[in-house]
Amino acid sequence: MLYPSIDALQRTIPSKYTIVTVAAKRARQIQDGKAPKVAEPKSYKPVGQALEELFSGDTTIIVNEKNNG
């Protein structure tokens, strides 16, 4: 079973698209050599570690809003 579950993640981040996008970007950083922010991740894969970081609140999401005016 996936930890954390998508339902648990959506309690803090309501958009599935945002969860997937942020987790993919953070997983790439982990894969490229950056250390995971979770002390003892349950997952050994970068995507799982990125999802654990999102769930724990260790990763900050910065939203860029385009100005259409």
Curated annotation (Swiss-Prot):
Keywords assigned: DNA-directed RNA polymerase, Nucleotidyltransferase, Transcription, Transferase
EC main group: transferase
Signal peptide: none
SMART domains the UniProt entry points to: RNA_pol_Rpb6
Reaction equation(s) it catalyzes: RNA(n) + a ribonucleoside 5'-triphosphate = RNA(n+1) + diphosphate
Any GO BP annotation: DNA-templated transcription
A UniProt-annotated Pfam family: RNA_pol_Rpb6
A Gene Ontology molecular function term of the record: DNA binding
Keyword Transmembrane helix recorded: no
KW Transcription (keyword) present: yes
Family, per entry: Belongs to the RNA polymerase subunit omega family.
HAMAP family: RNApol_bact_RpoZ (MF_00366)
Function: Promotes RNA polymerase assembly. Latches the N- and C-terminal regions of the beta' subunit thereby facilitating its interaction with the beta and alpha subunits.
Subunit note: The RNAP catalytic core consists of 2 alpha, 1 beta, 1 beta' and 1 omega subunit. When a sigma factor is associated with the core the holoenzyme is formed, which can initiate transcription.
Record-given protein name: DNA-directed RNA polymerase subunit omega
Gene this chain is encoded by: rpoZ
